[in-house]
């Protein structure tokens, strides 16, 4: 019987990002549906998600081994092999080829949703901080996408992501949730671990601080208009 190798796959910054983003998206949906004064929190959460997305893009370039985009950018042939049931051994380590598509799609849709949110105006009490830099036509288009298209794309991809996780956990008996909590995976063979030491976490804090600073600066542009 082969002894499983316990390997650190998801570094702490990636795990914190994942769960913070998940909770933030849930809160954004709730505040959007409630409306009224809850929209103040909707805007704050939107800026938090902006910071998280900036952080993840940077971390996808310099983060842990399996958190980097290079670790889950797959060639089409690799995806076809995975769908045919003949996956590469590394496909079960970090994000699988299908999981990678889900990650990139969700990041892209969230970037579009946050971007259009910054340009949106509800014509009542709340307007994004970048509305003063563009024409009314652009504001109208951004608002329309944000309310009528983007939110449903986000909800659809989140639902698809949850269903996929449930399928892999319940049907394929793969533990996907626990590694995103404690970072480690039990694998059949040795693989390179993600670096997750104090230096890595310190760098992540610096990146996060800069990302939060950028989001705060963007939010301050609204106040500068008055």
Language model features: what each stretch is:
Residues 1-226:
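Membrane-embedded alpha-helical bundles that constitute the cytochrome b-like, heme-associated redox core
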């Amino acid at each position: 019987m082969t002894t499983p190798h316990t390997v650190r796959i998801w570094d702490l910054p990636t795990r914190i990002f994942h769960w913070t983003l998940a909770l933030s998206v849930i809160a954004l949906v709730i505040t959007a549906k409630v409306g009224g004064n809850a929209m103040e929190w909707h805007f704050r959460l939107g800026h938090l998600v902006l910071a998280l997305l900036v952080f993840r893009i940077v971390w996808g370039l310099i983060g842990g081994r399996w958190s980097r985009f290079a670790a889950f950018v797959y060639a089409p042939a690799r995806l076809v092999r995975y769908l045919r049931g003949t996956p590469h051994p590394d496909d079960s380590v970090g994000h699988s080829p299908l999981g990678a598509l889900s990650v990139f799609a969700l990041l892209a849709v969230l970037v579009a949703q946050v971007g259009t949110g910054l340009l949106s105006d509800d014509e009542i009490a709340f307007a994004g901080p970048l509305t003063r830099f563009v024409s009314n036509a652009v504001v109208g288009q951004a608002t329309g996408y944000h309310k009528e298209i983007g939110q449903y794309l986000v909800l659809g991809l989140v639902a698809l992501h949850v269903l996929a996780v449930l399928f892999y956990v319940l049907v394929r008996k793969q533990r996907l949730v626990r590694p995103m909590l404690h970072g480690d995976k039990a694998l059949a063979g040795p693989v390179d671990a993600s670096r997750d030491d104090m230096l890595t976490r310190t760098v992540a804090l610096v990146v996060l601080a800069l990302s939060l600073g950028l989001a705060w600066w963007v939010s301050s542009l609204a106040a500068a208009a008055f």
